[in-house]
Amino acid sequence: MGKQKIRIRLKAFDHRILDQSSEKIVETAKRTGAAVSGPIPLPTEKSIYTILRSPHVNKDSREQFEMRTHKRLIDILEPNPKTVDALMRLDLPAGVDIEIKL
């Protein structure tokens, strides 16, 4: 595998498990001899939902909820087959969305 790059995008609502997952991926890639760039923090996506507090009247009384999606980007440069195999066997916590591009 010459001059190839694996790009991994991680998304999660909780930044702590996102950082733990990215550290696991970086450590695994470095242990197998690949060069790693990252984890690079990407902008946090914030979704705001506004609802009425009352089921009947009082439109002026509203409540807002927000959901933050934290993102990280990891580039693995010059991966070897051992790196790919180790990443496939890696066990990451639930709640982390992983997107891998070769």
From Swiss-Prot:
PROSITE patterns: RIBOSOMAL_S10 (PS00361). The keyword Ribosomal protein applies. Keywords: Ribonucleoprotein, Ribosomal protein. It comes from the Bacteria. Disulfide bonds: none annotated. Transmembrane segments: none annotated. NCBIfam families: PRK00596.1 (NF001861), rpsJ_bact (TIGR01049). Involved in the binding of tRNA to the ribosomes. Belongs to the universal ribosomal protein uS10 family. Part of the 30S ribosomal subunit. This is Small ribosomal subunit protein uS10.
